A protein has these predicted regions:
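Non-catalytic terminal/accessory regions
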Residues: 1-193
Length: 193
């Protein structure tokens, strides 16, 4: 029987994706490590790998493969938070009719049966980096508009109307964004995509 040992995730939700690691341990100190790539822009669980009793180097290499490219901090999560994320993003796969990645028998029970009072909004402070600068906030929200990320737009605006606005007919890719300060708290965002 495996017991929860620890979990951590990147705080990169504002970029549309995050990495999640859940580490389990049994009474004989055997480790089972689960690595999930969570995609909020329509894929749900985008990638999954597991390692049984990895060496420290193997675990580190897989963590860096999953999380290194985000350039984000890694934050500790509780068992409840980490299992909620697997269930939440895994259910997106069903909603968008996308295949579950990797050996789904290792996590399908979490998706189908894990129950909690958590909501994705309750986790935003952990899974999103703190944004202190106005231009940085504009850049992130521009990315969310182009990606049709209604969930983030609703969270940050508090408005269904803004969350349902879009500037592309399908999820787009942001190529560049130039933000000009026009003074008095006004900005112009010039965006080729």
């Amino acid at each position: 029987y495996m017991n929860f040992n620890f979990a951590k995730a990147t705080n990169s939700r504002l970029m549309g994706s995050l990495g999640l690691i859940i580490n389990w341990i049994d009474d004989e100190n055997n480790h089972f490590c689960q690595y999930f790539l969570l995609d909020a822009e329509g894929l749900g669980l985008a990638d999954y790998v597991s390692l049984n009793n990895p060496t420290q180097e193997e675990a580190y290499m897989e963590e860096e493969r999953l999380m290194g490219g985000f350039g984000s901090d890694r934050v500790e999560l509780t068992k409840d938070e980490s299992l909620f994320l697997v269930s939440y993003f895994g259910n997106k796969n069903f909603y968008y009719d996308k295949l579950l990645p990797g050996d789904k028998c290792e996590y399908i029970d979490i998706i189908k049966n894990y129950k909690t009072d958590l909501t994705i909004e309750k986790l935003y402070n952990k899974i999103c980096k703190r944004v202190d600068e106005e231009v940085e906030f504009i850049n992130y929200m521009t990315m969310r508009f182009i990606a049709w990320d209604r969930e983030s737009l609703k969270y940050f605006s508090g408005s269904d109307e803004i969350a349902n606005m879009h500037i592309t007919n399908i999820n787009g890719t942001l190529l560049k964004n130039v933000v000009s300060d026009k003074g008095q708290g006004r900005y112009i965002s010039n965006v080729p995509f």
